[in-house]
Every structure is written in structure tokens, then in C-alpha cells.
Design a protein with these regions (language model features):
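Short, structured secondary-structure boundary patches
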Residues: 3, 58-66, 157-163
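Catalytic metal-binding/acid-base residues of hydrolase active sites
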Residues: 17, 45-46, 142-143
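Helix N-terminus capping/helix-initiation residues
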Residues: 23-24, 91, 139, 145
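Divalent-metal coordination cores built from histidine and acidic residues
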Residues: 26-134
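Active-site core of metal-dependent hydrolases
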Residues: 109-178
Length: 178
């Protein structure tokens, strides 16, 4: 019974890198919760680049008992490019156990569009592991179009937040991406 009560929806920040705030998760919560953000979906890409699975474990642990609901998309490209040596490498097998965590919603920002389009084994293993568990795959492929976009979408990438032109956004929407 909600008689005499007020229900107010909370804002869900659908894509952040929580560690980029440069504060611990509890401090981040203190900053955003009073302003209406009640949930976030974070990609711990930056901390994973440096600390690997220990960084992901830290973020999961530090957010477990917050009032702020913190959900995760697993970092898909660590390191971000094959030319980088940032401290860690995450392969499909390194991510598999995380999919059992109910706060892990899927695979974040598949930045390796060329590897996806060329069906590189390591990239496809990450996509398949996520898809086989019924989780979402988010994209990160600015400028991708035509046959390459078709291949990217066929690999299961459901979204792309990198569109900067209306025509690019429309093409991706027509292919079923959001």
C-alpha cells in the first residue's frame, strides 16, 4: 500500500566508466545518489587495462553493498589496441566466470570492429561466450557502415554509442542496433 507516499523514478546512467571519476565507488555514490541517479551500468575498462581481473574484482567488491545499483558490462578489449602494453591482457577465458554474476549484464564496447568483421578467433570467442549466456553485447564502432556493419551486427553487437552523424545513426538503427 503506497497511500500517502510519493514514487519518484531514478535516473539510470546507461554507460559510464566509474573508475574515471577518480574516486572510490562509495564516494561516487555520495555524489550522484542525492541528485537522482539510482543505478549505473559501468564498463571497468580503464582499471582492467592496468590491473586485469584484479581490477574487475575490486570494482565488483567495492560496489556490492552500495545503495546505488551498480551493474557491469565486461571490458571487451584489454588492451584497447594490439599496439598497447598497459599492464593486462584479458582473453575470453578470463571473462567467463564473471557472466555468472547477476550484476554482469554483458560485454562492453566491442572496439575491435576489424577483428569482429574479420572473424578473429579471440574476438569471436568473447562474443560467443557472452551471447551463449543470453547477455548483451555493446558496440563501439564509429564510422562503420555497409558490409562491415552487416558483419558487425551479425556477430551479435546490439548497440553503438559512437555515432556522430545522423546518417550513420540511421544506418545502424536500420540494421537493428540502438
Amino acid at each position: 500500500d503506497l497511500s500517502g507516499k510519493i514514487i519518484c523514478p531514478g535516473f539510470i546512467d546507461g554507460h559510464i566508466h566509474l573508475e574515471s571519476s577518480m574516486v572510490r565507488p562509495a564516494e561516487f555514490e555520495r555524489a550522484v545518489l542525492p541528485h537522482g541517479t539510482t543505478a549505473v551500468i559501468t564498463d571497468p575498462h580503464e582499471i582492467a587495462n592496468v590491473a586485469g581481473t584484479e581490477g574487475i574484482d575490486y570494482m565488483l567488491y567495492e560496489t556490492e553493498n552500495l545503495m546505488l545499483d551498480v551493474f557491469f558490462m565486461l571490458p571487451s578489449c584489454v588492451p584497447a589496441a594490439d599496439l598497447e602494453e598497459s599492464g593486462a591482457v584479458l582473453r575470453a577465458e578470463d571473462l567467463r566466470a564473471y557472466y555468472e554474476n547477476p550484476r554482469v549484464l554483458g560485454l562492453a564496447e566491442m572496439m575491435n570492429a576489424p577483428g569482429t568483421v574479420k572473424a578473429e578467433e579471440g574476438v569471436l570467442a568473447k562474443l560467443k561466450d557472452c551471447s551463449d549466456r543470453g547477455k548483451r553485447i555493446d558496440g563501439h564502432a564509429p564510422g562503420l557502415s555497409g558490409y562491415q556493419l552487416n558483419a558487425y551486427c551479425a556477430a551479435g553487437v546490439a548497440s553503438d554509442h559512437e555515432c556522430s552523424e545522423v546518417e550513420e545513426a540511421l544506418e545502424k538503427l536500420r540494421r537493428g542496433q540502438w
